[in-house]
Amino acid sequence: VNLTAAEKTQVTNLWGKVNVKELGGEALSRLLVVYPWTRRFFEHFGDLSTADAVLHNAKVLAHGEKVLTSFGEGLKHLDNLKGTFADLSELHCDKLHVDPENFRLLGNVLVIVLARHFGKEFTPDVQAAYEKVVAGVANALAHKYH
């Protein structure tokens, strides 16, 4: 990801305030509610039949935390996202057969969740930096597909 020093600082400063458990669960839940076709990758998580079921599904919330924990790890390696996410890219491509477009969708949802939680602190400049990061992470996760 091609970020300026100021953008890297904005991203890492905001990320230091993120409650990974709360926002991870919210981001993955929103993905599954807004884009219901993504639920097919999580059928083994139990009842995902309604928005309420998704929003209160313990496995969805736990996996959302896991996803954002990995995302946070990627923020420590912004200059090597492909290397950082190589194993996850392989897993999602070869074993789980996840449509790589879903990575982009989840990134978009994450930006919305961050904006909702941080309000005025999530300035247009911070949003622009996060848009670059989520695009870079989505690209890194889709790398094995190419």
Curated annotation (Swiss-Prot):
Subunit structure: Heterotetramer of two alpha chains and two beta chains.
Residues recorded with modification S-nitrosocysteine: C93
SUPFAM superfamilies xrefs: Globin-like
GO molecular function, one term: oxygen binding
Role according to the record: Involved in oxygen transport from the lung to the various peripheral tissues.
Phosphothreonine modifications at: T12
Stated family: Belongs to the globin family.
Residues that bear N-acetylvaline: V1
Domain Globin: 2-146
Name of the protein in question: Hemoglobin subunit beta
Tissue: Red blood cells.
Keyword Iron tagged: yes
Cleaved signal peptide residues: none
One Pfam family in the UniProt entry: Globin
GO BP, one annotated term: hydrogen peroxide catabolic process
UniProt keyword terms in alphabetical order: Acetylation, Heme, Iron, Metal-binding, Oxygen transport, Phosphoprotein, S-nitrosylation, Transport
Binding site for heme b: H63, H92
Keyword Metal-binding: yes
PANTHER family: HEMOGLOBIN FAMILY MEMBER, HEMOGLOBIN SUBUNIT BETA
Domain of life: Eukaryota
Modified residues (N6-acetyllysine): K59, K82, K144
Any one annotated GO CC term: hemoglobin complex
